[in-house]
């Protein structure tokens, strides 16, 4: 068996990892802007306060600059808004990541908050798959339907093209459960998207593509 050299002979310049995606349906109008190499700055307007708080965790703990503006049919409920933000954010990530050359690809994180503990593992595999277990102790948090956590991550996974395992391992307070999930997700993203200086310009797969 023969293998090509892992690292190219000359270093490749790091491409700009930003994206802007707009999505309009009869239910929502959304614009998302991301900078994967940011500082954690966020401007978030979904109309759902607790959801904005969770999205802020992605920005802050992932060191991702994130701007989301959403006008959704909240007079019905938050389902379309939360799901469609996940879809649009996933599309923006896919565009910003590009061909995945030089990234570490895999990331994981454990995050505690008082009694709650969550683990998230992500693989930028190009194969969408969500495996989620969060035994929420309440049906809503500040008007946010906890069932929509699944809808957000399913939308993201399908359009970012990632495999995502989410497990809330412990928790009594539903706010703490949800917050540890989003913080761990952010930290896992940050690890997976970090550029590996020893594999600059190389796609992290023996197949040569992802």
Curated annotation (Swiss-Prot):
It holds the Pfam family IGPD. It is found in: Cytoplasm. CDD domains: IGPD. InterPro entries: IGPD_sf (IPR038494), ImidazoleglycerolP_deHydtase (IPR000807), ImidazoleglycerP_deHydtase_CS (IPR020565), Ribosomal_Su5_D2-typ_SF (IPR020568). GO terms for molecular function: imidazoleglycerol-phosphate dehydratase activity. It comes from the Bacteria. Pathway: Amino-acid biosynthesis; L-histidine biosynthesis; L-histidine from 5-phospho-alpha-D-ribose 1-diphosphate: step 6/9. Keywords: Amino-acid biosynthesis, Cytoplasm, Histidine biosynthesis, Lyase. GO terms for cellular component: cytoplasm. GO terms for biological process: L-histidine biosynthetic process. Its EC number is 4.2.1.19. The keyword Amino-acid biosynthesis applies. It catalyses: D-erythro-1-(imidazol-4-yl)glycerol 3-phosphate = 3-(imidazol-4-yl)-2-oxopropyl phosphate + H2O. It is an enzyme of class 4 (lyase). Belongs to the imidazoleglycerol-phosphate dehydratase family. This is Imidazoleglycerol-phosphate dehydratase. It comes from Acidovorax ebreus (strain TPSY). The gene is hisB.
């Amino acid at each position: 068996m023969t293998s090509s050299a892992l690292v190219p002979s000359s270093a490749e310049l790091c491409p700009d990892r930003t994206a802007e995606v707009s999505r309009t349906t009869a239910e929502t109008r959304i614009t998302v802007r991301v900078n994967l190499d940011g500082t954690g700055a966020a401007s978030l307007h979904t109309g759902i306060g607790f959801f904005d708080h969770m999205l802020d965790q992605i920005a802050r703990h992932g060191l991702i600059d994130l701007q989301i503006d959403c006008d959704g049919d909240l007079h019905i409920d938050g389902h379309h808004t939360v799901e469609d933000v996940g879809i649009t954010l996933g599309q923006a990530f896919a565009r910003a990541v590009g061909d995945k050359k030089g990234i570490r690809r895999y990331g994981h994180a454990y995050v505690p908050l008082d009694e709650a503990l969550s683990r998230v593992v992500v693989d930028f595999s190009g194969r969408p798959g969500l495996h989620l277990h969060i035994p929420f102790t309440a049906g809503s948090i500040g008007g946010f339907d906890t069932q929509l956590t699944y809808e957000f991550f399913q939308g993201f996974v399908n359009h970012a093209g990632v495999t995502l395992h989410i497990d809330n391992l412990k928790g009594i307070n539903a706010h703490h459960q949800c917050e540890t999930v989003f913080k761990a997700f952010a930290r896992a993203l940050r690890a997976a998207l970090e550029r590996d200086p020893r594999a600059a310009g190389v796609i992290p797969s023996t197949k040569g593509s992802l």
